């Protein structure tokens, strides 16, 4: 459909990794394994936080939310990536592109806020253990989780709605998904309003939550160093270390994508970072938490034991 000096595209072509046809099969296998592992790992974490009564605490409520976000985030883009890696026609319709863009932004933005909330939860648990159950009661935790979701979903809606109104002078997206920065590179003219919205949202969801995380961990570290019991110190380091590892991986990748000078030569690097950010990080989250957390490992063993026992009874 023709407009004034621009076209409203009904279909987009995703360039993806078509410049490297020899790597597409390798990337397909890599992405498929990562995606299936993400689904299995995060679904297991959600399941054990629901079924195990010992995990009915704020930390595991937030961890369950994080796992659900990771499933939604990867499911928004990876299935399309897998199909396109094996297809000669790497296309996506406008509505599919819009949904993909929104879900990726919404889940990513929500996770940025939730990681800061989880840092505050660890701060209260370690620095104010006697008042923890009062400060982090069910109502407060539910509100914190809700604020994370609402903030992420509303900022994503704002960015997506404005991005989709910008006239585009092409329909070849130099990416494997409808990533907002890649789509905006097709804009016929630079939009000051869109650039301002992107900058404000990026600052709101990246440096500010990171600052809150850093402040929380400064207090946490000072408290841990004053713990005289070696067992208590190791337990505190274990739970905080898992969260801090996830924070560094997630915010590091996000900052390298959204708060750096734009460059036409950096698109190849952006695609690699985006692949790691969108596929590898969600897969690693449950592994990091389960490997470094005795309660999670015990709950997983208990769940596997029940499944094994059930299968044994069925065979008898």
UniProtKB/Swiss-Prot annotation:
The chain crosses the membrane at residues 21-41, 66-86, 98-118, 144-164, 200-220, 239-259, 271-291. It comes from the Eukaryota. Residues 42-65, 119-143, 221-238, 292-316 are cytoplasmic. Disulfide bonds join 97-188. PROSITE patterns: G_PROTEIN_RECEP_F1_1, G_PROTEIN_RECEP_F1_2. It is found in: Cell membrane. It is a multi-pass membrane protein. Residues 1-20, 87-97, 165-199, 260-270 are extracellular. Belongs to the G-protein coupled receptor 1 family. This is Olfactory receptor 2K2.
């Amino acid at each position: 459909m023709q407009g004034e000096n621009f076209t409203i595209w009904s279909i987009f072509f995703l360039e993806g990794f078509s410049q490297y046809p020899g790597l597409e099969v390798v990337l397909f296998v890599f992405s498929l394994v990562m995606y299936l592992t993400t689904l299995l790992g995060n679904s297991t974490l959600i399941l054990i936080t629901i079924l195990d009564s010992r995990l009915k605490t704020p930390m595991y409520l937030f961890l369950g939310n994080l796992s659900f976000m990771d499933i939604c985030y990867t499911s928004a883009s990876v299935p399309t990536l897998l199909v396109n890696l094996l297809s000669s026609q790497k296309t996506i319709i406008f509505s599919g592109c819009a949904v993909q863009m929104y879900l990726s932004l919404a889940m990513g933005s929500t996770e940025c806020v939730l990681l800061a909330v989880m840092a505050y939860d660890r701060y209260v648990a370690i620095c104010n253990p006697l008042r923890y159950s009062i400060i982090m009661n069910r109502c407060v935790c539910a509100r914190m989780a809700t604020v994370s979701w609402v903030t992420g979903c509303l900022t994503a809606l704002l960015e997506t709605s404005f991005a989709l109104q910008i006239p585009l002078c092409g329909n070849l997206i130099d990416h494997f998904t409808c990533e907002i920065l890649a789509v905006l590179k097709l804009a016929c003219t630079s939009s000051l309003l869109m650039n301002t919205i992107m900058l404000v949202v990026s600052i709101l969801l990246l440096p500010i939550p990171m600052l809150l995380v850093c402040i929380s961990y400064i207090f946490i570290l000072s408290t841990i160093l004053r713990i005289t019991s070696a067992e208590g110190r190791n337990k505190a380091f274990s739970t905080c270390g898992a969260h801090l590892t996830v924070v560094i991986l997630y915010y590091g990748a996000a900052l390298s994508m959204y708060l750096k000078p734009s460059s036409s030569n950096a698109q190849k690097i952006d695609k690699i970072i985006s692949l790691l950010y969108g596929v590898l990080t969600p897969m690693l989250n449950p592994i990091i938490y389960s490997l470094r957390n005795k309660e999670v490992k015990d709950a997983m063993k208990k769940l596997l034991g029940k499944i094994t026992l059930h299968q044994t009874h069925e065979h008898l």
